[in-house]
Amino acid sequence: MAGHLASDFAFSPPPGGGGDGPWGAEPGWVDPLTWLSFQGPPGGPGIGPGVGPGSEVWGIPPCPPPYELCGGMAYCGPQVGVGLVPQGGLETSQPESEAGVGVESNSNGASPEPCTVPPGAVKLEKEKLEQNPEKSQDIKALQKELEQFAKLLKQKRITLGYTQADVGLILGVLFGKVFSQKTICRFEALQLSFKNMCKLRPLLQKWVEEADNNENLQEICKAETLMQARKRKRTSIENRVRGNLENLFLQCPKPTLQISHIAQQLGLEKDVVRVWFCNRRQKGKRSSSDYAQREDFEAAGSPFSGGPVSFPPAPGPHFGTPGYGSPHFTALYSSVPFPEGEVFPPVSVITLGSPMHSN
């Protein structure tokens, strides 16, 4: 059936096309939908464009038109305005409301064109704002207020001689949370999200009020800067003291009651000694785990004995096979060294003639 359908499909012209018409002048490819609307069943008469047979002519219940795909038969869904029409009726124009989804009707009689989909999806927040025009107006007004406040904050900070880092430190003094210089910079540049801008504005508003009323704010800022610098100070231990700590660590890796005595003996703070021993234990754990893994790998060695081991290739085409049709193998050599006195086995080399000149 597939072969018969393909032959009829390729060469059967529609009815009414003689040798003189445009359809009969020369053979050509016929559009599948046009062919299905004109062509009758195999061995039956052709069907005109306005009249279609009923189920009694076909002998089977009506079904979607078949299409031949890759040697098999596949059924396609019904097309809008294309195919067989009811028996005894002429072709009628389909109203626009009954047209299929995604198809636009054309008054000129041309083929229907799919509707264009708008590029991209609109953000959820924007959709919510469009649904609530009153809320959208309130948010726009609040955004303008934030822009004006950001300009005021920058002017006030530069006029009083504060840096963005100073503002973050003073906020830490006032509210117990230090903000970074990057956060203040992004607020002034309106680069934070709308939600974060609204959260940070009351805190910065408090800073503006304190900067106008409190003259000692600059001194507080300097004191806080010194405290932050002291917190960030990196502890450095001399080589001699570090050597003594290493010796003590070998004797007792985890001292508890001896930390105070060790700190007093070496002239260090108790917290410094405690942190050093904690870091040293972590370093020892990492080193021991790496060493154990390396020992296990070396003890296991290679799963193959000495000498080449052949494996079949992976599935797929292989080019440049030296045997010209013989199975291709990849030689893997073991990393286990040969014992002393043992030499490599001789490798036999077979000279292959070129297949182009072979008789």
From Swiss-Prot:
DNA-binding region, residue intervals: 229-288
Sites of Phosphothreonine modification:
235
Record domain POU-specific: where: 138-212
Q: What is the lineage of its organism?
A: Eukaryota, Metazoa, Chordata, Craniata, Vertebrata
Q: Does the keyword NAD apply?
A: no
Q: What UniProt keywords apply to this chain's record, in alphabetical order?
A: Activator, Cytoplasm, DNA-binding, Homeobox, Nucleus, Phosphoprotein, Transcription, Transcription regulation
Q: Which Pfam families match?
A: Homeodomain, Pou
Q: Which GO terms describe its molecular function?
A: DNA-binding transcription factor activity; DNA-binding transcription factor activity, RNA polymerase II-specific; RNA polymerase II cis-regulatory region sequence-specific DNA binding
Q: Which residue ranges does the record annotate as region Disordered? A: 1-53, 87-116, 287-322
Q: Which residues carry this modification: Phosphoserine?
A: 111, 236, 288-289, 354
The cellular component terms of Gene Ontology attached to this UniProt record, alphabetical and capped at eight, are:
chromatin; cytosol; mitochondrion; nucleoplasm
What family is this protein classified in? Belongs to the POU transcription factor family. Class-5 subfamily.
Please note every region of biased composition (Low complexity). 299-309
Indicate the segments annotated as coiled coil, or none if absent.
none
Q: Name one GO biological process term.
A: regulation of DNA-templated transcription
Question: From which residue to which does the signal peptide run?
Answer: none
The protein's matches in PANTHER family, at most eight in alphabetical order, are given as: POU DOMAIN, POU DOMAIN, CLASS 5, TRANSCRIPTION FACTOR 1-RELATED
According to UniProt, the name of this protein is: POU domain, class 5, transcription factor 1B
